[in-house]
């Protein structure tokens, strides 16, 4: 099954997550099909903390990809950020 999930990157104590489309049997940080965004929980000031390519995410969902619970929460958060702008 294909899933959209977070792959951890960054340094020790400084996490950075890539939002990736991957086969569910692969390791969390292993080989992935496509990168569709990122999440930086430690963003400060004017740094961008969340970016999602919604067109690519919608494409993969239409192909049957499942969202992880965390990615689902972040997509909702991203939608709320985009409405006022």
UniProtKB/Swiss-Prot annotation:
Which controlled-vocabulary keywords does the entry list?
Ribonucleoprotein, Ribosomal protein
Q: Name one GO biological process term.
A: translation
* InterPro entries cross-referenced by the UniProt entry: Ribosomal_bS16, Ribosomal_bS16_CS, Ribosomal_bS16_dom_sf
Q: What GO MF annotations does this protein's record show?
A: structural constituent of ribosome
Which superkingdom is the protein from? Bacteria
Q: Which Gene Ontology terms of cellular component type are present?
A: cytoplasm; small ribosomal subunit
Pfam families reported for this sequence: Ribosomal_S16
The UniProt family comment states: Belongs to the bacterial ribosomal protein bS16 family.
Q: What's the protein name?
A: Small ribosomal subunit protein bS16
């Amino acid at each position: 099954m294909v899933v959209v999930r977070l792959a951890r990157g960054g340094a020790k104590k400084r996490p950075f997550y890539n939002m990736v489309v991957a086969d569910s049997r692969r390791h969390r940080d292993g080989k992935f099909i496509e990168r569709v965004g990122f999440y930086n929980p430690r963003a400060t000031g004017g740094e961008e903390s969340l970016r999602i390519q919604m067109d690519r995410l919608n494409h993969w969902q239409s192909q049957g990809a499942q969202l992880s619970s965390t990615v689902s929460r972040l997509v909702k958060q991203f939608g709320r950020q985009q409405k006022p702008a």
